């Protein structure tokens, strides 16, 4: 056995005297030197050669018997556990590794290696000999033959080998050492790994440069080495701890390094010659260096070398941190210092190579401990970190480097708890519980101790926050803002730690981490916004959420949690049981549960209450608490959530589904009738009911409960793109007009219901529980939460499956209640109206309005306003009933913006006169007299912002200004300085629903501010003669505001109207009237510059009244006499009035939802005034004035049947046409010329402003004019000889910097800033003797 022979050899050498041992060593060396001449092909004979070698060696010396003691010593010397005793254990480790590298040529070798690795002691006397034997054998594998006289050389080689190995061991990271000592095997493996990594990176770098053809080098400046030295010297000369180095991105070698580097890195300057920069880096930082110096990511040096750029600006480029070797502090131990590296991309002209080589210039600044002089001030010792729910560092602020001693790459991806003091780790669980409780809001907690790199602890005060995923409402990551309170004992945080043992995860660390992870799986139920940009970060969202949450939850969070739990269980049951049954049961259950007071609110409120009660009754086990949190959050809506919800709804609406399926909703009465049945089965159905409740209730509608199994939601196209998470305020921007796939009816129902109620609820954060109506309204918000769940479905596949069921339930239950509720002309943001929802549910005609014939019908949702509650302050709103045939969307709360009380538009209204407000007319005309007329006297009840008494009309012409307006035009904003005008004849308006047939409005007194309305006399007072059918019981109350109101026309709304249906965008009462309105608008516009335009359509329907800000004209056109409208057929008469009222109501209700964006309308109606609508105060803001919005879109005003679907975007008009052909209502619309449609969407622009902007852009572009090359100049001279005489301006032809002082000549550049068309060559160039020079513009044309 080879192993026995080796041991015999070891024992024999031990027994020899020193002289004999020396001879033996020489003989062995000579044998191995001969073996070095063997070729690599002899590997196959390694085992036999090895045996032969041992035999030969043993023949030289007599073979004594193997002493067990000596054998044991020899074996023990190879333990490898002793890092310091290199000659012993390391030698044997090399021996074993050498054989391992060759695959253990023989079993004996393998056994021998195993035996050698077992022992723990070393024998120094024999280790050197054994080392030489093993090194030669393992490295060279040569046969045993011949001798050599190179003993001295071999001895030196052995010493060098030992020294190199010791130095190599110094590079081994502490975490790879065993008990603080480096083993040879581990060191060699680590060295091999590092070499491979460096080589791979170099190859990748070269491949990258070849493949990309140096794309980033196109605009990179080229410098010589001397120029690089000159440029960088100005940055480093003032800082003794800073040096500059240029590294070739092709070869990785140092092209240039500043003189300071030798002093800072404590080495000779010659050391850097032809050296690769990565060789100076700590092995663990090599990958960071390569990643951070990717060519296409580097900024070009000329970016920061401009005169206007300061040194500080350049240093603020993205930097990274690396450790660079800086000599040896102790023998065999390399010292690394951290440096902040700021990279730039340049080209360096290499004299040895023809082409310039792409290089990276690095400004390296040594980083010192923040606790050593010059110290970082205590109040500046602040840094931030983020970590994941699994407690792994995700990001570390670079400010932490001098404070913690760790580089960012050292911490990222490592457990947070490992770096904390063991006694402080349990605090992290409590902190994360509070994070979940605060829902993104920052908070402070008790200090924690953090271990720095040198092993000492610092004490930090931390402000914790989190980012809440707006889709799943779960914590995405946790943010900590740390301030160091107490520094470490050892101020040098970069010093090596005193201990070397590995940081092994303590069992408590793993346990706490798991608890935190499970905790953060729960959705955040708190409505608070994320302090760092998650939901509600805009502030207004937070307010909305907080308000809604307080009232929705009714202060009982437990109920919500229980609801959520039940919901999760119900979701599973829903799968097993019929969805329809489930939804029906749910609807009944909801109704029954709803308290009588909430019944008043209507199905929306009922559902909410029912859910609360039902879910509490059926509270699920506590293990569902996490789910509850998810659901709970939903009742509280942020703008962002609502927007997402709206987008989903629009997506569903866009799907091609029969209108009947979409509109199918049972009357609220039917729901009530089924209440008893449902109640009977409440217990059995509870899980289902809960799930239904979930679907119907806002809370339950929140993101699916953790652990709840959800089926995938089959949605067309791009549900995930429904909304931008950041577009929280821009409601219209979130609207998505989606494709043609057929959505499921329930989805569509959801979309419809929420569209009205959602917008309402979201728009109006319910006012404080001062009024039950407000609370009820907030409950509606909860229902909207169901749609929010739909959003969650997009991001969570498990939720998708649940949504399908949810959609059905929502459609039948919530949707019915919502539909009834919305159809009943609930003002979009009025909490009080919710109180009347229950009553409205019973109103007849609900079904009809809900049926939608338009397949593409898109209900416009109003952007949730800041807080409807704040505006309404708990006031009651008159009950509004939907008109039969009226577009459902128009009646949706979003449509009936708080501005529903806005000025009522009358066909013959004088454009410039403010309209009287009818106190009771908050809603549009009810479809039938049966609808209780809120009555003019009900104005106070309406609780609308219209607090004015019937006699008092607050803002003349503000929103109330009425004019027959062609949808195309924007009208000038009414002067808010105008005095409030009162109609003295207001008494003429009877409180009873019907208008007196001959009611006449007395002439309006002239406005105090004549400037906006100079032609007031021009408009004679025209009495309104209305003989409305008895069915018209309500007249919208027109509330004027003192503030000027900009009509909420789609134009004024801007992009927001894009969400509205095509008809609404067209702003035509019917498709037939589109062209007529177009013509009328033209005539009216030409007739007068008046800001108000009125026109009657042929059918006698009064054009929608709208006031818009016109940049210029303030005059108003006289409207056609009211008699014309009256002369039209009876249907047209009622329809006209209906249209006006509906228009008034819907537009105001929508807050220009149709006119601009249903979403923006909400904001406008809530008083944001974004549209210029004066909605904030009265909610009747200019949204009323945007009469052109929805009802212009309504299809047939004469029939009063508005079966239109809002067109979300003009770009989708083609998509819209696809469905238009399927519905007769849209046939005419489909054939309408695109130019006509476009006319209604062009925003007004100030000519002067536009020209000014264009001129500014032209000036900027002028400086970027191309310059001629020499070849081009020669060609031009051949064609245009005058150019050679200096006719071409230098601004065009000059190839040098025209801004340099040396190049500026007299008046060459004086005219450079002038418009191009104004520049003439005669003025710009010196006399060239050429009298026929052409203007520069002409020259430019020739050049092009």
UniProtKB/Swiss-Prot annotation:
Motif interval(s): Nuclear export signal 1: 161-170
Lineage: superkingdom: Eukaryota
Biased composition (Basic and acidic residues): 99-111, 560-573, 583-597, 825-836
Pfam families: bHLH_PER, PAS_3, Per3-like_PAS-A, Period_C
InterPro entries: PAS, PAS-like_dom_sf, PAS_fold_3, Per1-3_PAS-A, Period_circadian-like_C, Period_circadian_regulator
Keywords of the record: Biological rhythms, Cytoplasm, Nucleus, Repeat, Transcription, Transcription regulation
CRY binding domain: region residues: 1244-1344
Protein name per Swiss-Prot or TrEMBL: Period circadian protein homolog 2
Species of origin: Gallus gallus
Chain's gene name: PER2
């Amino acid at each position: 056995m080879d192993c026995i022979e080796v041991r015999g050899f070891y024992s024999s050498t031990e027994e020899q005297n020193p002289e004999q041992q020396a001879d033996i060593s020489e003989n062995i060396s000579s044998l191995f030197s001969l073996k070095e001449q063997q070729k690599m092909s002899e590997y196959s004979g390694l085992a036999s050669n090895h045996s032969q070698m041992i035999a030969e060696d043993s023949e030289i010396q007599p073979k004594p018997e193997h002493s067990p003691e000596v054998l044991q010593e020899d074996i023990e010397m190879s333990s490898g556990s002793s890092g310091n005793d290199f000659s012993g254990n390391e030698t044997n480790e090399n021996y074993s590794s050498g054989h391992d590298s060759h695959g253990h040529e023989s079993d004996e070798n393998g056994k021998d290696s195993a035996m050698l690795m077992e022992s723990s002691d070393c024998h120094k006397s024999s280790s050197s000999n054994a080392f030489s034997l093993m090194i030669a054998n393992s490295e060279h594998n040569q046969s045993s033959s011949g001798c050599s006289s190179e003993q001295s050389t071999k001895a030196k080689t052995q010493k060098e080998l030992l020294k190199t190995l010791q130095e190599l061991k110094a590079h081994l990271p502490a975490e790879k050492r065993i008990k603080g000592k480096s083993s040879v095997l581990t060191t060699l493996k680590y060295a091999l790994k590092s070499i491979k990594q460096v080589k791979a990176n170099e190859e990748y770098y070269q491949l990258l440069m070849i493949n990309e053809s140096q794309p980033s080098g196109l605009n990179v400046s080229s410098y010589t080495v001397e120029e690089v030295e000159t440029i960088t010297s100005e940055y480093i000369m003032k800082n003794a701890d800073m040096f500059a180095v240029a590294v070739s991105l092709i070869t990785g070698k140092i092209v240039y390094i500043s003189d300071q580097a030798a002093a800072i890195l404590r080495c000779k300057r010659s050391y850097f010659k032809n050296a690769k920069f990565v060789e100076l880096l700590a092995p663990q930082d090599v990958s960071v260096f390569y990643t951070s110096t990717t060519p296409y990511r580097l900024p070009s040096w000329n970016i920061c070398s401009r005169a206007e750029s300061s040194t500080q600006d350049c240093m603020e480029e993205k930097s990274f941190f690396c450790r660079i070797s800086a000599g040896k502090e102790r023998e065999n131990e390399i010292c690394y210092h951290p440096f902040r590296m700021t990279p730039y991309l340049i080209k360096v002209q290499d004299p040895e190579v023809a082409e310039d080589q792409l290089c990276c210039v690095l400004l390296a600044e040594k980083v010192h401990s923040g606790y050593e002089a010059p110290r970082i001030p205590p109040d500046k010792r602040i840094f931030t970190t983020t970590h994941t729910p699994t407690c792994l560092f995700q990001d570390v602020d670079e400010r932490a480097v001098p404070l913690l001693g760790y580089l960012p790459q050292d911490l990222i991806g490592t457990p947070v708890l490992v770096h904390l003091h063991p006694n402080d780790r349990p605090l992290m669980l409590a902190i994360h519980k509070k994070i979940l409780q605060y829902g993104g809001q920052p908070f402070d907690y008790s200090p924690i101790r953090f271990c720095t790199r040198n092993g000492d602890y610092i004490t930090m005060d931390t402000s914790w926050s989190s980012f809440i995923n707006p889709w799943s409402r779960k914590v995405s990551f946790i943010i900590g803002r740390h301030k160091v309170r107490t520094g470490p004992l050892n101020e040098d945080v970069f010093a090596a730690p005193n201990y070397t043992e590995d940081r092994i995860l303590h069992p408590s660390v793993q346990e706490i981490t798991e608890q935190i992870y499970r905790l953060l799986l729960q959705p955040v139920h708190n409505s608070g916004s994320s302090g760092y940009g998650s939901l509600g970060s805009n502030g207004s969202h937070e307010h909305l959420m907080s308000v809604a949450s307080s009232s929705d939850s009714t202060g009982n969070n437990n109920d919500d949690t229980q609801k959520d739990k039940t919901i999760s269980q119900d979701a599973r049951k829903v799968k097993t049981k019929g969805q329809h049954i489930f939804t029906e049961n749910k609807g009944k259950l909801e109704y029954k549960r709803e308290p009588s007071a909430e019944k008043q609110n209507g199905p929306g409120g009922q559902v909410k209450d029912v859910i609360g009660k039902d879910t509490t009754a059926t509270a699920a086990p506590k293990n569902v608490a996490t789910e509850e949190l998810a659901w709970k959050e939903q009742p509280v809506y942020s703008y962002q959530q609502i927007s997402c919800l709206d987008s989903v709804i629009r997506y569903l609406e866009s799907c091609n589904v029969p209108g009947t399926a979409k509109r199918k909703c049972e009357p609220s009465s039917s729901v009530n009738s089924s209440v008893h049945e449902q109640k009977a089965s409440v217990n059995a159905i509870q899980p289902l009911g809960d799930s239904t409740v979930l679907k119907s209730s806002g809370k339950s509608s929140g993101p699916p409960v953790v652990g709840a199994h959800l089926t995938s939601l089959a949605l067309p196209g791009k549900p995930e793109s429904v909304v931008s998470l950041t577009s929280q305020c821009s409601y219209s921007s979130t609207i998505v007009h989606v494709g043609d796939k057929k959505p499921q009816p329930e989805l569509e129902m959801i979309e419809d219901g929420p569209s009205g109620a959602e917008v309402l609820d979201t728009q109006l954060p319910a006012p404080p529980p001062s009024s039950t109506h407000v609370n009820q309204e907030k409950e509606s918000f909860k229902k909207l939460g169901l749609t929010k769940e739909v959003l969650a479905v997009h991001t969570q596949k498990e939720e998708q499956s649940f949504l399908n069921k949810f959609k059905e339930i929502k459609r039948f239950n919530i949707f019915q209640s919502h539909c009834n509720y919305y159809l009943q002309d609930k003002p979009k943001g009025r909490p009080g109206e919710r109180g009347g929802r229950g009553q409205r549910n019973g109103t007849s005609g609900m079904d009809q309005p809900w049926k939608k014939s338009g397949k593409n019908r898109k209900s416009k949702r109003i952007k949730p306003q800041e807080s409807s509650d704040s505006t309404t302050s708990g006031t009651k709103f008159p009950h509004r009933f939907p008109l039969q045939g009226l577009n459902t969307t128009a009646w949706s709360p979003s449509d009936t913006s708080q501005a529903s009380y806005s000025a009522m538009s009358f066909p013959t209204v004088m454009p410039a006169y403010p309209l009287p407000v009818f106190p009771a007319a908050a809603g549009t005309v009810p479809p039938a007299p049966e609808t209780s007329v809120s009555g003019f006297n009900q104005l106070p009840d309406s609780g609308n912002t219209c607090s004015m008494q019937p006699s008092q009309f607050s803002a003349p012409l503000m929103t109330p200004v009425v004019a027959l307006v062609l949808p195309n035009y924007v009208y000038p904003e009414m002067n808010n300085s105008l005095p409030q005008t009162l109609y003295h004849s207001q008494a003429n308006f009877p409180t009873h629903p019907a208008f007196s047939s001959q009611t006449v409005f007395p002439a309006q007194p002239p406005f105090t501010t004549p400037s906006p309305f100079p032609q007031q006399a021009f408009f004679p007072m025209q009495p309104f003669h209305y003989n409305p059918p008895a069915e018209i019981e309500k007249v919208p109350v027109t509330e004027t505001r003192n503030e000027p109101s900009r009509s909420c026309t789609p134009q004024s709304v801007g992009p927001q109207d894009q969400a509205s249906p095509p008809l609404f965008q067209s702003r035509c009462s019917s498709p037939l009237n589109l062209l007529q309105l177009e013509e009328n608008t033209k005539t009216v516009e030409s007739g007068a510059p008046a800001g108000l335009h009125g026109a009657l359509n042929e059918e006698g329907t009064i054009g929608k009244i709208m006031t818009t800000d016109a940049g210029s004209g303030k005059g108003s056109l006289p409207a056609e006499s009211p008699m014309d409208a009256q002369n039209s057929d009876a249907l047209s008469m009622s329809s006209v009035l209906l249209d006006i009222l509906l228009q008034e109501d819907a537009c105001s209700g929508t807050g220009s939802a149709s006119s601009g964006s249903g979403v923006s309308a909400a904001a406008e109606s809530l008083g944001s005034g974004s549209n210029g609508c004066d909605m904030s105060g009265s909610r009747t803001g200019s949204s009323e004035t945007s009469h052109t919005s929805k009802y212009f879109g309504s299809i047939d005003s004469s029939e009063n049947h508005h079966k239109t679907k809002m067109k979300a975007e003009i770009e989708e008009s083609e998509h819209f046409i696809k469905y238009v052909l399927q519905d007769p209502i849209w046939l005419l619309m489909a054939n309408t010329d695109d130019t006509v449609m476009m006319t209604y969407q062009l925003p007004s622009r100030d000519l002067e402003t536009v020209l000014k902007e264009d001129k500014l852009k032209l000036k900027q572009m002028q400086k970027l004019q191309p310059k001629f090359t020499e070849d081009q100049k020669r060609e031009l001279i051949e064609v245009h000889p005058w150019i050679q005489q200096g006719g071409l301006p230098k601004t065009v032809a000059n190839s040098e910097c025209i801004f340099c002082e040396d190049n500026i000549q007299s008046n060459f550049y004086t005219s450079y800033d002038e418009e191009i068309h104004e520049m003439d060559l005669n003025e710009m160039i010196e006399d060239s003797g050429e009298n026929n020079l052409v203007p520069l513009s002409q020259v430019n044309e020739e050049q092009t």
